[in-house]
Regions:
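A broadly tuned preference for mixed-charge, low-complexity surface segments
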Residues: 1, 9, 61-65, 98, ...
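Exposed acidic/Ser/Thr-rich ligand/metal-binding surfaces
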Residues: 1-94, 153-166, 249, 259-272, ...
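Flexible glycine-/small-residue-rich
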Residues: 10-12, 42-44, 98-100, 143-147, ...
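Polar, glycine-rich mid-to-C-terminal structural blocks
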Residues: 39, 61-138, 144
């Protein structure tokens, strides 16, 4: 329908065995429909043959979301509490590009977004598709950084690397650029911000509540991947305590659910360690 939000909500177990079943053909079909202004979001159900990778792929191609519904509570969250954000976009093709000042930052690492990476030249190319943001929702990008001159650097400095020249950028840690399109627009809008000491929290405790909780969630994700990149002492308990300290009002109980997930994951991790070769009896 013209001048309306057109979105297909696909409920599936991810086993596409009727109609288009070839992954590449399916992705191409979704991409063509996206160009006509039709969004696609995927809600996954079932166990056993559940195909999460395929669902994530076509949802990204269709500028939508992919969620797994395993409980009545999750269904209520997706189809009631978060419905507006899951259906109505407020920004299309949102791109973030961060340039770190080598005079202040020796190393950096983006946590997550492995399937959303763009080439540097794609940032200014409005023809390159990117993610969308729904009404009432927000997106957080977390970078792990090592200050210049720190003993914690994991790699040696570049022999021929050129440090940033002193001047107007001396007090900057990074320069953030954000591009987005208004829904239906062909050209993007650019927003920039220089990150300085004014943006820095002096300690973890003084950081905003949302930032502390987001860090706990990122740490949880890293632990699920093995935790090899996490520092000593930042394990399940530290992640849980960080989340507890930033739980806030938690109107719908989502943060409390996350904290409970850390307990369940810690228990499962301990059980797996006992049954692994060379562990336990």
């Amino acid at each position: 329908k013209k001048d309306a939000v057109n979105r297909v909500m696909l409920l599936t177990d991810g086993d596409f065995n009727v109609g288009i079943s070839d992954p590449e053909q399916l992705e191409d079909f979704v991409s063509r429909k996206r160009e006509t202004g039709i969004y696609l979001s995927v809600l996954g159900f079932g166990r056993g043959n559940y195909n999460d990778a395929m669902m994530q792929k076509i949802a990204q191609t269709g500028n939508g979301i992919a969620v797994y519904v395993d409980t009545l509570s999750e269904a209520r969250k997706v189809l009631a509490d978060d419905m507006a954000g899951n259906i109505f976009p407020i920004a299309d093709d949102v791109k973030i590009q961060v340039e770190f000042n080598p005079a202040r930052i020796a190393e950096y690492r983006l946590i997550g977004y492995e399937t959303r990476m763009l080439d540097r030249e794609d940032f200014n190319n409005d023809k390159v598709d990117a993610g969308d943001i729904g009404a009432g929702t927000s997106v957080t990008a977390i970078y792990e950084v090592t200050p210049a001159g720190s003993d914690g650097a994991a790699i040696d400095p570049l022999r021929y690397g050129e440090a940033a020249k002193a001047g107007s950028t001396k007090g900057e840690y990074a320069f953030v650029k954000l591009r987005y399109k208004a829904p239906g627009a062909a050209e993007s809008t650019l927003i920039t911000h220089a990150v300085t000491d004014k943006d820095r929290s002096k300690s973890v405790e003084s950081a905003p509540e949302w930032a502390r909780f987001a860090t706990a969630v990122a740490g949880f994700g890293e632990m699920l991947k093995g935790g090899d990149a996490l520092g000593t002492g930042f394990g399940w308990e530290a992640i849980r305590n960080l989340g507890l300290g930033a739980k806030g009002e938690d109107e719908f109980g989502y943060r409390a659910e996350f904290i409970e997930l850390t307990r369940l994951a810690e228990t499962a991790d301990a059980q797996a360690a006992l049954t692994s070769p060379g562990k336990g009896e």
